[in-house]
């Protein structure tokens, strides 16, 4: 919905600012933590201030699809991303946080995200392919937003799993019309 502003004696139509919120954890999909709570309530606060928002996180194997009502978005899924010379199918799922009237998009891939833990095993050892998982997640978000044809004004990154997003924006996607005016 456009915003109407009175400027110099005229009514000016201003588009809503678009914020792409990328997080490695969001409540209620993962257990409560400081990061997961921020991932849940910050996008809602941004949306409540009149901004248009899209929220993304990885679809970890510990997320219960039935309880959280995740479903695949066929029109966005189906492409392959090449990571380390190997094709990996990109699957996009979506769920809603009803209380916030907010959708969350999930980046999924069987090789990278079907484990029962998020970034480390039960002994606390980081997965050796977390670098590839982070690359897949960052590229998956960019490719999905391109398919949505939704040009964000701002990208907000939360968690080290999103750390490659600013680099990808600067080096790979800066000439893409969807991202040419996007700030991080």
What do these predicted regions represent?
Residues 20, 54, 154-156:
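A structural signal for isolated positions on well-ordered beta-strands in alpha/beta enzyme cores
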Residues 2-13:
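Short, Lys/Arg-enriched N-terminal segments with co-localized hydrophobic residues
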Residues 55, 59-147:
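A conserved catalytic-core segment of Leloir-type glycosyltransferases
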Residues 15-32, 57-59:
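Nucleotide-activated donor-dependent transferases that construct or modify glycoconjugates
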